[in-house]
Amino acid sequence: MASKEFHIVAETGIHARPATLLVQTASKFTSEITLEYKGKSVNLKSIMGVMSLGVGQGADVTISAEGADADDAIATIAETMTKEGLAE
């Protein structure tokens, strides 16, 4: 299992466009990938799940992956979040 914490810096938080991008990125992997915020954990491959968290600017979230490609999944998601200016 691999996981990484992120601090959301995007002014609008994880709204529709970045949520869609994260779901598309996560869906490329076979691992089970979750997004945790305020004690609630959702499937990062589910747009409805991600949107239901209402993650805003300044939030701290944890993304975890379990499976054969877990390390690659976390690395790719981290790269996407940083590149898109979503998190640091």
From Swiss-Prot:
Residues annotated with Phosphoserine modification: S46
SUPFAM superfamilies per UniProt: HPr-like
Keyword Transport: yes
Domain called HPr: residue spans: 1-88
Gene Ontology BP terms: phosphoenolpyruvate-dependent sugar phosphotransferase system
Major localization class: cytoplasm
Pfam families attached to this UniProt entry: PTS-HPr
Active site: H15
InterPro entries membership: HPr (IPR050399), HPr-like (IPR000032), HPr-like_sf (IPR035895), PTS_HPr_His_P_site (IPR001020), PTS_HPr_Ser_P_site (IPR002114)
Any Gene Ontology CC annotation: cytoplasm
PROSITE patterns from the UniProt entry: PTS_HPR_DOM, PTS_HPR_HIS, PTS_HPR_SER
NCBIfam families (alphabetical): PRK13780.1, PTS_HPr_family
Family membership: Belongs to the HPr family.
Function (record text): General (non sugar-specific) component of the phosphoenolpyruvate-dependent sugar phosphotransferase system (sugar PTS). This major carbohydrate active-transport system catalyzes the phosphorylation of incoming sugar substrates concomitantly with their translocation across the cell membrane. The phosphoryl group from phosphoenolpyruvate (PEP) is transferred to the phosphoryl carrier protein HPr by enzyme I. Phospho-HPr then transfers it to the PTS EIIA domain. P-Ser-HPr interacts with the catabolite control protein A (CcpA), forming a complex that binds to DNA at the catabolite response elements cre, operator sites preceding a large number of catabolite-regulated genes. Thus, P-Ser-HPr is a corepressor in carbon catabolite repression (CCR), a mechanism that allows bacteria to coordinate and optimize the utilization of available carbon sources. P-Ser-HPr also plays a role in inducer exclusion, in which it probably interacts with several non-PTS permeases and inhibits their transport activity.
Name used for this protein in its record: Phosphocarrier protein HPr
Organism: Lactococcus lactis subsp. cremoris
